[in-house]
Structure formats: structure tokens, C-alpha cells
Amino acid sequence: MDTVDALTSLEGWHAEGFAARVHYRGADDHYSIEYYEPSDCILYWKVKGDGETAVPVGRETVPDPLRKRIRQDLTEAGIDPDVESRVV
């Protein structure tokens, strides 16, 4: 099983070619998190209220509980959780 398939076996993750994506909705903020297999990295996107527009955001602006969840998902999928903090 490749890394994208491994992530999509977890709750909320969906495959899109060589990437896997999950959406997170907090009390006030909405995020789309993407794992890219070729570059072995995570990108965070903040989704605007319309649900159609997203802008990339630095991980330091992402709530710690969400970052922790993403690292846990990576671990469960057999991916080194340190890729979550890799600078892109």
C-alpha cells in the first residue's frame, strides 16, 4: 500500500492522484490539509467562509490540536510524522 492509500484508509482522508486531502472544521476556522507523496510534505490551506476559496497558511498559524492530529494520522499511515513540520 502506498502512502496516499494508507492515509485514505483513515477517517476523512480522500485521494486525489498523488495527494491525499482531509478537511477540518474548528469552531471558527476551516482548513484543508494536503499530503503530497512525491515531495513527502504537508500543506495547510485555510478555507474561506464560502468554502470555495482557500489560501496556503504557515503551519505556525494552525492550531496545535490540528497539527497533532495530522501527525497522528501520518504515524498511523506509516509515514514519518516529521514531514508535518518540514519547511516547503
Q: How does the language model describe each region?
A:
Residues M1-V88:
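Acidic, polar-rich N-terminal leader regions of halophilic archaeal proteins
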